From Swiss-Prot:
Positions bound to NAD(+): 80-81, 85, 155-156, 185, 196-201
Catalytic activity annotation: NAD(+) + ATP = ADP + NADP(+) + H(+)
A GO MF term: NAD binding
Primary residence: cytoplasm
PANTHER family: NAD KINASE
Family, as annotated: Belongs to the NAD kinase family.
Protein name per Swiss-Prot or TrEMBL: NAD kinase
Keyword Kinase set for record: yes
EC number: 2.7.1.23
Cellular compartment(s): Cytoplasm
Enzyme class: transferase
A Pfam family it matches: NAD_kinase
Enzyme active site: 80
Amino acid sequence: MTETTERIVLLVPHTGRSSNIESAVLAAEHLDRAGITVRVLVNEEDDPIKTHPVLGRFEHVIHSRTAAEGAELVLVLGGDGTFLRAADLAHAVDLPVLGINLGHVGFLAEWESDSLEDAVKRVIDCDYRVEDRMTLDVIVRDSDLEVIGRGWALNEVSVENLNRRGVLDATLEVDFRPVASFGCDGVLISTPTGSTAYAFSAGGPVLWPELDAILVVPNNAHALFTKPLVVSPRSTVAVESMSGTSPAMAVMDGFRPIPMPPGSRVEIVRGKRPVRWVRLDSLPFTDRLVHKLRLPVVGWRGPDKQKELLDAETPDQP
């Protein structure tokens, strides 16, 4: 990066709590003092950022495909929902995205709020690495196979029944061959990154993010064969609604919906463009999983500890 190149960071804060605003101020001021232009995402409605004495003086943008244009990085301060919305902006212009957790579990965040200053310094120093996370590309077709919607997802595509008094009658399809038909509340098609989110709550397995695969999880399906499936990343997964069933919705990452009238189908393939994910440490995913989900590991000794015990029990040879 040359000295004459303007450095810009898009700051995406969750403003639901006063402590979150304070974190956004800290990050913005550190970046500003380092000579980095700060651009702040705001809501179209009343947003406390617009009138804040510090955050109000920075450039403000609303959520759009061009919000992150010209920036070098998207910095997210919030939980998983905030991260997914920020990832939508970063993905549109192929930028890296870094999440700092200000929420509860914050599975998508790289670091916690108590390390915010260190994280911002790493951004200032360009001291981070970027890894690609698999995404999904989505097409919705009507009963005549005409395209009526397109989208993408980082976590999952949730095919949801809109009639809470009945079930969604659907057929699951892999590589244009039928797998099973059933009545259900919906079907989740997830990436490895999204396997710890909605798909996990619906009974799906956890997939390590380095794995290239597509996870399919029927949601409250009424059939003998309703087990989760892990299919090839080269496959096309489709969910086809029956012509006489309830209307449905294909929802990407919880906030980008495409209506699915009866008889329509949604087709999902591996995304052409990944999300560029900022990493600040080399912590194994196993450790992150245990920490975020607070999994009990009491009594674990590990190979190093077991070796010490074996060495202590082995008598010295003459």
